[in-house]
């Protein structure tokens, strides 16, 4: 039900996993999603500043919803990290009640992406906003999952990120290769500076053995 808005860009989104205090160690993120049986809602909460979600694309200005990774808690039991769909701004761009954030400011590159931070203070979302492919919570708070092992469940959930990180490394390697290829092609054609013999052609940059 949320895919159409994401696909047609009518609802710009943010991927809210990384926290100020936890980047690669996703299993230890501190944001919580506590289930309230009385209202059948999850309460998304950031307990301290180290748990603020950080360096999120679209978070600083334009994001209207976020997929928030948090520790899922039901009946006092922590079932580990799960993902939740959380609206963060209204149509005018103002933060919704309980949601706050700030811009990450200028970066070393890619400043066209409005990276920012988000934090949540007792933000309530419907039970059905849990992205429940790998774990679900019934109306009475009963937790269930098709993957019994918490460790296997966690790594299965994050499996898609592995492909993304490999793709990023491949893209960087490809860009480096293309840059080197262009530089060598130029160095084999460009000529400048005459040798001591005026009858000789100007020198190719690739002919130099030392800079």
Report residues per predicted region.
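Mobile "lid/hinge" segments at catalytic clefts and subdomain interfaces of large enzymes
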Residues: 172-175
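Conserved small/polar residues in nucleotide/adenosyl-binding loops
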Residues: 209-210
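Long, structured ligand/cofactor-binding scaffold of large enzymes
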Residues: 1-35, 41, 48, 53, ...
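Flexible, small-/acidic-enriched active-site or ligand-binding loops
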Residues: 96-122
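Core alpha/beta catalytic barrel or barrel-like domain that forms the active/cofactor pocket
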Residues: 10-19, 83, 189-202
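Secondary-structure transition/capping motifs at alpha-helix termini
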Residues: 9, 35-41, 73-79, 91-94, ...
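A glycine-rich, basic-preceded beta-loop-alpha segment at the flavin cofactor/substrate interface
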Residues: 56-58, 119-164, 184-206
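A short core secondary-structure module
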Residues: 37, 41-101
């Amino acid at each position: 039900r949320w895919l159409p808005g994401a696909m047609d860009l009518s609802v710009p989104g943010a991927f809210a996993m990384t926290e100020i205090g936890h980047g690669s160690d996703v299993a230890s993120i501190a944001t919580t999603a506590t289930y309230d049986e009385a209202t059948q809602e999850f309460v998304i909460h950031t307990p301290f500043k180290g748990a603020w979600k950080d360096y999120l694309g679209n978070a600083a200005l334009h994001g209207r919803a976020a997929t928030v990774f948090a520790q899922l808690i039901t009946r006092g039991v922590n079932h580990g990290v799960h993902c939740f769909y959380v609206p963060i701004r209204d149509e005018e761009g103002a933060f919704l009640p309980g949601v706050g954030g700030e811009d990450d400011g200028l970066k070393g590159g890619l400043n066209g992406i409005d990276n920012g931070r988000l934090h949540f203070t007792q933000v309530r979302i419907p039970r059905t906003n849990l992205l429940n492919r790998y774990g679900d919570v019934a109306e009475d708070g009963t937790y269930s999952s098709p993957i019994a092992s918490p460790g296997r469940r966690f790594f299965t959930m994050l499996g898609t990120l592995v492909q993304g990180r490999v793709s990023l490394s491949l893209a960087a390697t490809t860009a480096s290769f293309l840059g080197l290829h262009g530089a060598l092609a130029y160095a084999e054609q460009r000529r400048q500076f005459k040798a001591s013999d005026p009858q000789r052609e100007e020198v190719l940059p690739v002919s130099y053995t030392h800079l």
